[in-house]
Amino acid sequence: MDDKSRGTTNAKHLATDTDHPPDDGSAGLPEPGSVKSKTGLFTARSTQKALDGERDEFATFRTRPPQQAAIAMQKPPVPVNKPVTLGRPNSTPELRQTESQGSDDRAEPGYPMSKPVRNMTAGADTVENLLQDNRELPVRNPPIPHRNPAMHPDTSPRPPDIASVSGTKPRPTPPPPRKGGAKPVPKSPSRNEPKIHGEKQSYIPLSNSDVDLTGADEARPTLPPRPDPSRVTHIPPSDHRILLEAHEHSKRHLTPSSPLLDRSLQNNGSSPDLIDYSPGLDEEAMSDAIVASSLASRKAFSAKKVPPPPPPQRQLRTHPLLRPNTPSSDSPRSSSPAPSLRHTLRPATKVGEEELDHHKHRKHIIRRHPHKHHEGDRKRWQSEVTEKERKRYEGVWAANKGLLIPISNSKERSSLEEVSCEGYPPSASEMVLNIAVREIWARSRLPSSILEKIWNLVDRQKIGLLTREEFVVGMWLIDQQLKGHKLPVEVPGSVWDSVRGVPGIRIPKVPSR
């Protein structure tokens, strides 16, 4: 009742001030009172206005019951656009003290104060009209800022009331305004904040359907029933270990590819018998199950790995210094023989005995440079035909002797008549005709002038036929010309002597003194 009487007194006082504005004469005169008291009154009213504005801002978004609306009607609303006056000419210290006590009572009400939808004056409307207007006008629902109850406690230290101090003390010192000194208005318990009843706390989530937009008389929608936590099956850690051990024992008898499948099933969460992902499972059992599954997967994959065989040791190959190309006897031979090229030419002929004897004194252990000029090593003009060359030339002679030579069958004619009539000797069958010689020698591709010179050097009979010795010497001169040697002015006698020997018989040479 004391609160109601105080609210009525304040409402009447404000109504009197509003209905009877000050006269023009009183507006020009200075108001009574000291400067410090006016400053304290201004600071107290501004602080009270800020508190009322914050209270109205938070109370706008809440629905109020009829009892709160009736109490709010008894308290005068705070004018928004009305300028604040420092003092009134008829104000007394008792009235100021009453106003300060009324502000203290309004700052700490038993019920939160809500801001009306439209401006109303005290005594203008009744409680029934206010409730009817609240049903007709929709209340806007702006986004409510989320606040953590732990970070913003409801109880905070309140600074001392400056207006009451200024009324009792003659000259108080106004303290500086504090930023965080305003006491937050106690809020009505909302659905997203914990409701404290003794020591029990329950958290109810806020949804759009739970906000009452029509009014306080309509019944609020009922929330869906929450699942009973007793129905959730809690599997103790021991049961998980038993299941994992049984599963690990069964995995040992499977194929090696089965651990991969089991691990993939565990990763995908498709094995409800091992790990229960229900929300009622406590953290200790979940952690034990995860650790046990990881250990089981490690044991499944930790198979004994056979170390790879060591690489074969490389054997050192030793080669002699003097003959690096010859293979050593210590090195192991490969099983497969080295591939050899096919021989498309004639096989290499063996070196003759005479050539070995001829180059016997020229053998050296260290081979010299091939392009260096040495007078003793250069090839000089050969003064004889070798046995090998002579055999080769005689083979050509034997294949072409007696060709295109007419031979008479009459034995009565004497040899002189044959020479005189035909011009061929009696042994013409062992000779080669000039026409056949020209065809054979032309295959050397030497110019005809060179071939003519060779013919003149070997044709000693001048009858158009060449004997065996003449034909062999002519073939030898052609080979010397092809090798780069010049033709001699006259064939030396040593060359004729080398071709006169009997074929197949070798005459040893007598060393000259």
Swiss-Prot record:
Mark out the compositionally biased spans (Basic and acidic residues): 14-23, 190-200, 237-248
Top-rank taxon, per record? Eukaryota
Q: Which InterPro entries match?
A: EF-hand-dom_pair (IPR011992), EH_dom (IPR000261)
Q: Where does the EH domain start and stop, copy by copy?
A: 412-502
Describe its function. Answer: Positive regulator of phosphatidylinositol 4,5-bisphosphate turnover and negatively regulates signaling through the cell integrity pathway. Involved in rDNA silencing.
Instruction: Indicate the family of this protein.
Output: Belongs to the IRS4 family.
Q: What name has this protein been given in UniProt?
A: Increased rDNA silencing protein 4
Q: Which organism is it from?
A: Aspergillus fumigatus (strain ATCC MYA-4609 / CBS 101355 / FGSC A1100 / Af293)
The gene it comes from is irs4
